[in-house]
Regions:
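Enriched but not universal
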Residues: 1-12, 565-570
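C-terminal, surface-exposed recognition/capping segments
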Residues: 361-364, 390-408, 417-420, 434-451, ...
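A short, polar/charged loop-to-alpha-helix boundary motif
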Residues: 451-464
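Extended, Lys/Arg-enriched charged tracts that mediate electrostatic binding to polyanionic substrates
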Residues: 44-122
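Autoprocessing Asn-cyclization modules and mimics
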Residues: 170-290, 295-309
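Primarily auto-inhibitory N-terminal propeptides
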Residues: 10-48, 55
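Short aromatic-cysteine micro-motif
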Residues: 74-84, 115-169, 310-437
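Short, polar loop/linker segments at the starts of domains and inter-domain junctions
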Residues: 28-41, 100-114, 150-168, 327-328, ...
């Protein structure tokens, strides 16, 4: 037997594929060989699979050189260094995906090969993305991106433990002056005049220094108190009391009361309440509901409480009741739509377009590899990874968990799979080093390069990789499906079967349930063009998942429930 034939046989012996008949309600996949014929696998086969075992956690700097830990979990690496990116390496995947009637087949391989049945296993388009040339590997953020800023004041997305996922209108950029004490991440910073409080995420100094008490620059805050606008106020609110919406039942502890016009005595006081905490419900403004507090305060809501409260320019800013700096402005809530998120992902590498927001070929390849590894679409039911962060209360501000929460970085097995130590439905999952991916939950993630259109077709970044994904997609950069976007929302099953969508998971029906078929929820498009989100938020329950797809947002959407995961394709 020739050397080439021996090598080919070795490759084929390693190939494991999956198939599923989508007319059946079962969530389980079956296993097959390189030509789609059924096989039975021994327990633990995954540890010997070159693709799954080749997924390893590493850290990468701006030069793009990976440093690996002592095992696939990444032991020995510093996951909290904001100057590096904590990534998961995915080795090149060759393969094929096809349908026989209603049965879908996915057969991945570590090398290119022609099967005995004549099927060519070719390089997956994820490894042509962001440039158009073939790659031997790609890298995906271990975590949803957090906010970081470098010494030059450039904001960038960072995959690091301890970071709060960066989501829209949730982070506040605040100028400061007269800085005398350098803060620490997670310190609470409070305005002495406004009463507004936020948690420190990052900062940079543009002039002066801490030692000379004249540091000036920008500080970035999360979990900033909220603003509830009101009018027709007849009785003053009292700080420390709980404000309650008469019809919504929304609550929040009153931190400060700001009257901008009118007077309580004449029943026309207008302004806003600074509120903190509460039950997270939004106040009703159409029609305006009555807000009251326990001391008799009364007014009507003209704001729902989702807007961040402003600081007072030039006020003292304190940490633990000690003044550490002064506010340079009122603060700005940072928008974060898909294009902006992609820009912050690319900002880490400067102008290097090999960095960016995860694209659909990468995202859906990982989804198919998860199905291969775990054997089911009902991943939230697996004890090994749990349900993820999917059952926390709906909130007006970010209500998920931070990257690395509940000790998950150490709680997983040596292959990077497991769950945090917190309560079921409120603790993160991890699969092969990727937090919050296979169960969905915590936040939705933008997927740049797939564009839904209401009552229209899907536009998809061209699989040849020559065009860089953008939002909206640039003319000439994409292919389009023949099949129209599914305009019915629901738990979905089969995906579109056509050449343009060969490698992607675009819903073709809404015939599943939370425990049948795909087990994850699809929301139909509402805009032309729209933007695609994957995963699901911290309160979405069984609707979240690795195949959770939300096509109902506009390209301009910026929400505290939407973030993103970065990729680097060297």
């Amino acid at each position: 037997m020739g050397q080439f034939q021996v090598r080919t046989d070795d490759i084929l012996d390693e190939v494991v594929g999956i198939y599923k008949d989508w007319t059946q309600t079962t969530p389980f996949w079956s296993y097959c060989d390189c030509d789609g014929d059924p096989i039975t696998l021994p327990t633990g086969w995954q540890t010997r699979n070159p693709l799954l075992s080749g997924m390893k956690t590493c850290i990468i700097d701006t030069l793009g050189v990976p440093i690996f830990g002592d095992n696939p979990r990444g032991d020995g690496l510093n996951f909290a260094d904001k100057t590096k990116q904590v990534m998961v390496r995915v080795p090149a995947v060759y393969g094929d995906r096809w349908w026989e009637g209603d049965t879908e087949f996915f057969v991945p391989s570590r090398s290119p090969v022609t099967t005995p049945g004549g099927r060519s296993l070719t390089l997956h388009p994820a490894f042509h993305s962001r440039g158009g040339w073939p790659r031997s590997e790609l890298f995906v953020g271990r975590y949803y991106c957090g906010l970081a800023v470098n010494s030059a004041g450039t904001k960038y997305a960072v995959s690091a433990s301890g970071k709060q996922p960066w989501t829209g209108v949730e982070m506040v950029e605040l100028a400061f002056t007269n800085g005398s004490v350098e803060p620490a991440v997670n310190d609470y910073l409070t305005g002495l005049t406004s009463g507004v409080r936020g948690q420190v995420v990052d900062w940079y100094v543009s002039s002066g220094g801490w030692g000379t008490s004249d540091a000036a620059g920008k500080i970035y805050l999360g979990l900033v108190d909220e603003r509830v606008n009101f009018n027709t106020g007849s009785v003053a609110f009292t700080p420390g009391q709980t404000a309650t919406g008469g019809s919504s039942g929304a609550t929040g502890i009153v931190v400060a009361v700001v009257v901008t016009s009118g007077a309580w005595g004449s029943g026309d006081a207008a302004g806003y309440l600074v509120v903190r905490g509460g039950n997270g419900k939004t106040f009703t403004i159409s029609p305006s509901e009555v807000i009251t507090d326990g001391a008799g305060g009364a007014a009507k809501a003209t704001g729902d409480g989702t807007i961040k409260a402003p600081f007072t320019s030039s006020e003292d800013l304190q940490i633990s009741a000690s003044t550490v700096m002064k506010a340079g402005d009122a603060g700005t809530s940072l928008s974060l739509n898909c294009s902006e998120m992609d820009g912050y992902c690319r900002a880490y590498g400067g102008t290097d377009t090999r960095w960016g927001l995860i694209n659909p070929y990468t995202n859906d390849l990982l989804t198919m590899l998860a199905y291969l590894d775990l054997g089911t679409c009902n991943i939230q039911s697996l004890i090994s990874v749990g349900a993820g962060v999917t059952s926390k209360p709906a909130t007006r501000m970010f209500g998920g968990v931070n990257n690395g929460a509940d000790g998950i970085d150490a709680a997983v097995d040596i292959y990077g799979t497991g769950k945090g130590t917190g309560a079921a439905g409120q603790t993160p999952s991890m699969w092969r080093g990727l937090q919050d991916f296979v169960t969905g939950g915590n936040v939705y993630g933008f997927v740049i390069g797939t564009q839904p259109n209401k009552d229209g077709v899907w536009n998809i970044i061209h699989p040849n990789g020559l065009s860089i994904p953008s939002s909206p997609l640039a003319a000439g950069s994409f292919v389009s499906t023949i099949t129209q976007c599914l305009m019915s929302s629901g738990y979905w099953g089969a995906s579109i079967k056509e050449a343009a969508a060969k490698w992607l998971l675009l819903p073709a029906d809404a015939t599943g349930t939370n425990v049948q078929k795909r087990c994850d929820y699809y929301y139909a498009p509402n805009y032309v063009p729209g933007v695609l989100l994957a995963g699901g938020g911290w309160h979405l329950g069984s609707g979240a998942g690795v195949a959770g797809r939300y096509a109902g947002s506009a390209a301009s959407s910026s929400s505290r429930e939407i973030g993103g995961r970065l990729e680097f394709i060297p």
